[in-house]
Amino acid sequence: MMKNILAIQSHVVYGHAGNSAAEFPMRRLGANVWPLNTVQFSNHTQYGKWTGCVMPPSHLTEIVQGIAAIDKLHTCDAVLSGYLGSAEQGEHILGIVRQVKAANPQAKYFCDPVMGHPEKGCIVAPGVAEFHVRHGLPASDIIAPNLVELEILCEHPVNNVEEAVLAARELIAQGPQIVLVKHLARAGYSRDRFEMLLVTADEAWHISRPLVDFGMRQPVGVGDVTSGLLLVKLLQGATLQEALEHVTAAVYEIMVTTKAMQEYELQVVAAQDRIAKPEHYFSATKL
């Protein structure tokens, strides 16, 4: 059975971020994606200038009411949320999650708690971080913070892998069943590897891959692709280990392709065959 995912996050017309990054790779793995855009911008914000608008929160609810009106909401297997244009949008998304789960009690909510990194040029609206801590976290079935977001969610510093596993379990105690720490950064085992953790109440998996050096300008949308692909693999019945290994390899293939083409925007179309069947393999370790 094809899985249907309502993906509520940002959209850029040029390039790849949010839905514009994740939607195609998710489809390439065999999922139906229903993109619902929280913002429509000309390009991602790390260029330093952009045009476009943030969608009114009511717009998100209206679109989903339209899907409910044609009696298709019960076919939705998961809601994925990413970059929010405002905290109020977040409240509407939680209303949508409740509506989807009422129509399909098996549906999952995957929250990618994008909180912004001003030094990276990723800007989020006031109140969004607080929304994720108070409301997004307890409502989610799966949550995917990076290290900075993990520290904000658990409200204390995280300095190494062991502390990251414990912090993830603190989050699990508040609602989600699965936590993906999608970039361990300085808390990882090695400074020259890209490392992730996938944690449940009784399992923890660690994986690492080589860093791909883009110099000063790291491509945007890597986390969006990572979250989207992990959700697809889990919905398709992959184990935690299988999902983590495939996603790590697929994202690495995109990064390597992007670097080889000397591009700044993720080359998801050029890498499409290796997203579905990665040529590299990275082994996850059970902690």
UniProtKB/Swiss-Prot annotation:
Gene3D superfamilies: 3.40.1190.20. GO terms for molecular function: ATP binding; magnesium ion binding; pyridoxal kinase activity. ATP binds at D112, A144, E149, K182, R209, P210, L211, V212. The keyword Hydrolase does not apply. It is an enzyme of class 2 (transferase). Pathway: Cofactor metabolism; pyridoxal 5'-phosphate salvage; pyridoxal 5'-phosphate from pyridoxal: step 1/1. GO terms for biological process: pyridoxal 5'-phosphate salvage. Substrate binds at S10, T45, Q46, D224. Belongs to the pyridoxine kinase family. PdxY subfamily. This is Pyridoxal kinase PdxY. It comes from Escherichia coli O157:H7.
